Amino acid sequence: MSIIEIKHLTFAYPGAEKNTLNDVNLEIEKGDFVAIVGNNGCGKSTLCKTLNGLIPHFITGSYSGSVVADQVNVQDSEIGILARKVGYVYQDFENQIVRPTVLDDASYACMNYAMPDYLERGRKALAQCGLEGKEKEYIWQLSGGQTHLLALAGVVSLEPEILILDEPIAQLDPHHADLIYKILRNLNEKYGKTILVIEHHTEYIAEYCKHVVLMKDGHVEWKKRTKEALSRVEELQSCNIFPPQVTLAAYEMVKRNVIPKPELLPSSMEDGINLLGGLVCQQRGNDTGAGNFKHEKIVQFKNVSVSYRAVKGKAYKVFDGLGLDIHKGEKIALIGSNGAGKSTMMKLMTGLIKPLEGEILLKGRSVKDMRPEQLSREVSLVYQNPEDMFIKDSIEADIAFAMKERNQSDWEERAQSLLKRFRLLELKNRDGRLLSGGQMRRASLAIGIALNPEILLLDEPTANLDIATRKEIMKTLNDIKDITETVMIATHDMQLVCEWAERIIVLCQGQVIADGTRDEIFGDPEVVKRSGIRPPEIFTLGQEIQADAFCYTVDEFVKGFGGNGNEPDDEKNV
């Protein structure tokens, strides 16, 4: 029985020159768990917003076709009715948290509907979402993953049959990402909820989803069972979808005639080991670690301590005696679980947070009495949410803002140069908050380096991005050496870490527990376990097959385990 029926749906936003959705047809069965995939801008979020009535009742435009969700025609219904049929957790889920305490927030929607049992519904939803026992806590005491679960609980409290989540794990560490998906699986299997996720992380799709819907250029290309969908490597890559690394490794081995082609490519670790387990690694991946850096120290943390004070007066210590040196020219990845202190460390370097004890030196000078606006000439922070970088009504004005405020005579010429460099000339008059994810990232980077800082800090620069946009951001990071020599990123993206970083710093509960190269970090099981990080899937596959194999990318795995296989004519960098 279909719980969602979409027929010949076409939609264009007001003033848009072309349709965002084009003749979409889709049916989803009750109790299904579906991943919707496609490149940035293909219409995934727009399609989902037609299911809960946000389109066309709130966001108007050119709309034709029909959408039926849980036996209700969306166009003919009211949002108040649809909210109890279709629950939606948005990509910017923090905006769905509206009350100061956990139970108040979880039961708020039910209270708005004047349900007499609103508190009971809130408690039930919290239990279903793994937040039992957190009822009296303040929302700012929750971790990122718990906050996301609270947004989900607020939706679940209304007991909708359909749940939609837009990029549910984009900014979460592996532990919280697993927790989110385990909760979703329980809601699907135990409570019969039909779940749709918009997702770029195909390894989670492989583990949890039953079907995959591929969107391209505003229409649905196909809907297939997950294993079959993820085996269509070339088709997915053409839409900028990165299949699981296990799948890509097998695909490349088949292309090189190292193994015979299976009926379906593996998408899980178990299937990958079964198919590739007989191979032998003949060379290790080359570690790109910088080793002992000899360049000058540009930032020094000397016995730094930082605490936050909660509403009830209790102090929470983030750092206690932190000591660390950053050298000129380093490409550093800062990794660790949510709450480990990554963002706090970056804010200390920019002066947005001041240490309670110890000192921070920038090129030998204490930053204790320096204001953030003074430090911004030398240290620039690009925020996790790129929209937070936009304060004017156009990208051009945002890029020029800091330079104009500091009376730089060449601000106009430099703004044009940055627009050209970051391929933003055609977008220069657009409001940055209305751009696509990749365009926002490029624009925020241009703003971040406008003052030629010596140190560039980026918080989760590849979150919410498809493979093409992610590669574009990585290329940009490598291309700005002439402007900014020292770059530090805080990230949960271990593929980015292994492909880009020269030095990896691991934080755990406010302490640096490891600092070194890829081999030194991922080759130490104790560091991996204690920090909660998860090595790239391809690294784990290599280790399962051969304990001394250190392969951090699919390319390294193929070179190491490929033996005397033939190089394909259409070699692609995957």
Language-model features, listed with the residues they occupy:
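The feature captures the beta-strand-to-loop junction immediately N-terminal to the Walker
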Residues: 37-39, 335-337
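Helix-to-loop junction immediately C-terminal to a conserved catalytic motif
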Residues: 52, 350
